[in-house]
Amino acid sequence: MIGPSAAPGNAARGQLLQWVAVLLFFALVPLGRRSFFITMANEVLIMGLFAMAFNLLYGVTGMLSFGQAAYYGAGGYTVGLLLTKGVLPYSVALPLAPVVGAALALLLGPLCIRLSGVYFTMLTLAFAELVWGVVFKWYGFTGGDNGIQGIPVPEWFHHPLHYYYFTLAIVVAAVAVLRRIVESPFGAVLQSIRENPERTAFLGIRVRRYQLAAMVISGAFSGLAGGLFAGFHRSIGPDMLHWTKSGEVILMSILGGVSSFFGPLVGAGVILFIEDMIGKYTEFWEIWIGGIMLAIVVFFPRGVIGTLYQWTHRKGSRERDGNATAHP
């Protein structure tokens, strides 16, 4: 479960080990000196941040949004438009990506949170498709279905390894902030809303205000991920805002485990790796991916991280029970 544990000492050690494992893995990726690994790790970091931003809404607050791609795309187009039109340098354009993502969430959020459950989900989908339609048809400004190509970035970022370490630093800082938010009293209220919004409201907490805040924060981090994507690929298109992109990040979160903080990051890595590997060998890669995803969902019902934690916990419990029986 996301949030503080009942055993502070064990929880702190567990969190430290998680951070060390994640940082060590991504720090060692460039040692292979293969562009494939660096490119894949960059994709995982960006999509992992996007998935973790979404999970603040779904896994923490209990709000299933199909409109997350709107904020992701808004961040990407913010960077792309500002740089291609020569308005601002990259050092200013990238920080504006989360601002625009948050602003869009602040604009759409009050309308969406009036509803709950599947109605909230459908409303977020409708607004996201509206944003996508505007971007897709506005050729004079957004490039329409052609998107924006040749986004200029500082020359130092032309080397994939340099941009990788830059992305790693930004994502680590963003994830640390997300962690603090989840473990704060504010995060505890969000989890209370997920468990029982009526009871939370009965306690005098303005549920809609907290839900809107969660949407804005999630939109900001989604926008940041979109800005990083634009700088990495140096091109963007309207598919960034399509509902299928929201569906992809939902699948990543569920696959990795919505109850685990790092679960969405793991889910992003699994899905991107499977897509790349299978896509090299067959033109019917979507069918294979669908079958693999179905098997993973069946055998890992709580997500990869959640199921592994459950197995480890059961094994530890059996060992403790065995020791207690042997030494009464």
Task: Describe the role of every protein-language-model region.
Residues 1-25, 195-197, 202-209, 278-328:
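Cytosolic-side transmembrane-helix boundaries in multi-pass membrane proteins
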Residues 127-160, 166, 187, 234, ...:
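Extracellular/periplasmic helix-loop junction at the C-terminal end of a transmembrane helix
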Residues 69, 94-95, 212-299:
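Transmembrane alpha-helical segments in multi-pass inner-membrane proteins
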Residues 86-129, 266-267:
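Alpha-helical transmembrane segments within multi-pass membrane transporters and channels
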Residues 159-237:
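Helix-loop-helix "hairpin" substructures at the membrane interface of multi-pass membrane proteins
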Residues 1-49, 78, 87-93, 318, ...:
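Membrane-interfacial amphipathic/re-entrant helices at transmembrane-helix boundaries
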Residues 26, 30, 34-86, 110-120, ...:
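Single transmembrane alpha-helix segments in multi-pass membrane proteins
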Residues 41, 65, 78, 105, ...:
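Generic structural signal for small/hydrophobic residues in well-ordered secondary structure
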